[in-house]
């Protein structure tokens, strides 16, 4: 059995903690067979546990405990990932979704998508990454008082270009620079921008969507000092035809929405700056979680 989960890019500027997209980088978890102890083979670095301390297995345990179910065996697993760690592309969320599905398959829980999303939001705390990782495409979601409501929609046709810096930025560190509260006036302004962003995405108006992404009042202005590449890439985007540029998740990845016919030019112009990092031309993943050789 093989579980495949896409990377994600959250917030899209003003859609803080509620809007995300799935993109075509993947985490894969393969069940190799039963084992005396839980064991995970991976090449993700020595700081990533290979036993029950791994997020994959702590998630599995949380699901089994929630459902009051126990497994009769332990398993040898293989985990491979194209998703850069701690870069704002949902690496932890993809593992959480994989862990939920692993529990679903091994314990034959037959969970619905809504049940999986509820569990994921309880573990992660907000839906912006876990929802598109599970469902694919563009997802707009809200979790209030433990209840998650969501809409899945096709993302407007365009190219995506991600600049992934070589340095990590943990979400907890990126959240420390955010204010504890906004004034009522600030909240109304930020909300109105997010509303227009959402409407523009749902009506395929990328010009307006790009403007609203860059007008965010919730988080980007506070985090910009942590990601010096953001402003430079935004300026390059303005000069060479990008629809918009935003900080992916908590950063440090910067995402550009680009007309298909401008992708090559923008890639060349960014490469000319010799920034320390990698460029990834990406596409929307419209499938979300996939399971090969499912037990169901």
UniProtKB/Swiss-Prot annotation:
Give the metabolic or biological pathway: Amino-acid biosynthesis; L-threonine biosynthesis; L-threonine from L-aspartate: step 4/5
Q: Which PROSITE patterns match?
A: GHMP_KINASES_ATP
Source domain of life is: Bacteria
Q: Report the record's Gene Ontology biological process terms.
A: threonine biosynthetic process
Instruction: Give the keywords, sorted.
Output: Amino-acid biosynthesis, ATP-binding, Cytoplasm, Kinase, Nucleotide-binding, Threonine biosynthesis, Transferase
Catalytic reactions on record: L-homoserine + ATP = O-phospho-L-homoserine + ADP + H(+)
User: What residue intervals traverse the membrane?
Assistant: none
Q: Which InterPro entries match?
A: GHMP_kinase_C_dom (IPR013750), GHMP_kinase_C_sf (IPR036554), GHMP_kinase_N_dom (IPR006204), GHMP_knse_ATP-bd_CS (IPR006203), Homoserine_kinase (IPR000870), Ribosomal_Su5_D2-typ_SF (IPR020568), Ribsml_uS5_D2-typ_fold_subgr (IPR014721)
Q: Where in the cell is it found?
A: Cytoplasm
What's its EC?
Answer: 2.7.1.39
GO CC, alphabetical = cytoplasm
The Gene Ontology terms for molecular function here are:
ATP binding; homoserine kinase activity
Chain residues that bind ATP: 84-94
Concerning its family, UniProt says: Belongs to the GHMP kinase family. Homoserine kinase subfamily.
Q: Tell me, in a sentence or two, what this protein's role is.
A: Catalyzes the ATP-dependent phosphorylation of L-homoserine to L-homoserine phosphate.
Q: Which HAMAP family match?
A: Homoser_kinase
Query: Which NCBIfam families does this one have?
Result: thrB
Please give the name of this protein. Answer: Homoserine kinase
Q: Which organism is it from?
A: Lactococcus lactis subsp. cremoris (strain MG1363)
> Lineage, please?
Bacteria, Bacillati, Bacillota, Bacilli, Lactobacillales
